[in-house]
């Protein structure tokens, strides 16, 4: 029996971003770790910086073929400015049509909010976040 199976949107975006930023020549992105998890560091924060958390805030599925998800990109860095810059870089990379073309299943990504900087209330470390809405083709699996 074959059936459409929803995709883990956060993991798909994390894979797409790892590939998209691999060739990025920007010192603020040097050593950036991209993950769908955080919480193993001090006070529940990331284990290292710079760190990008890819999380899913909302998800809908237009059965059987298309999913839509709101993705939150949270960047921790050494300064609020650098965190905001990383959030902007990865948001731009995600919304670049070349990223969708290079990522099987990712049809489109559009910005939902611009990067905003803040301080992590749990760790006191600088962070920034942005959101994007992604459209994903749902694969058929047997």
Model segments located where?
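Short, charged interaction patches at domain edges and termini
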Residues: 1-19, 57-66, 105-142
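Small/polar-rich, solvent-exposed N-terminal microdomains that initiate assembly or binding
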Residues: 1-62, 101
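Short, solvent-exposed beta-strand edge segments and adjacent coil->beta transition regions
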Residues: 68-72
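Structural beta->alpha junctions
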Residues: 73-79
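Short, conserved charged micro-motifs
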Residues: 81-85
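A common structural junction motif
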Residues: 91-101
């Amino acid at each position: 029996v074959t059936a459409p199976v929803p995709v883990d949107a956060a993991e798909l975006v994390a894979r797409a971003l790892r590939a998209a930023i691999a060739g990025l020549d920007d010192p603020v992105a040097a050593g950036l770790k991209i993950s769908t998890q955080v919480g193993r560091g001090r006070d529940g924060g990331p284990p290292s910086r710079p760190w990008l958390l890819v999380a899913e805030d909302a998800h809908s599925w237009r059965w059987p073929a298309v999913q839509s998800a709101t993705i939150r990109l949270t960047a921790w860095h050494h300064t609020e400015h650098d965190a905001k810059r990383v959030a902007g870089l990865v948001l731009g990379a995600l919304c670049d049509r070349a990223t969708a073309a290079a990522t099987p299943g990712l049809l489109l990504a559009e910005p939902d909010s611009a990067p905003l900087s803040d301080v992590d209330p749990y760790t006191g470390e600088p962070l920034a976040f942005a959101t994007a809405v992604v459209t994903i083709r749902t694969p058929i699996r047997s």
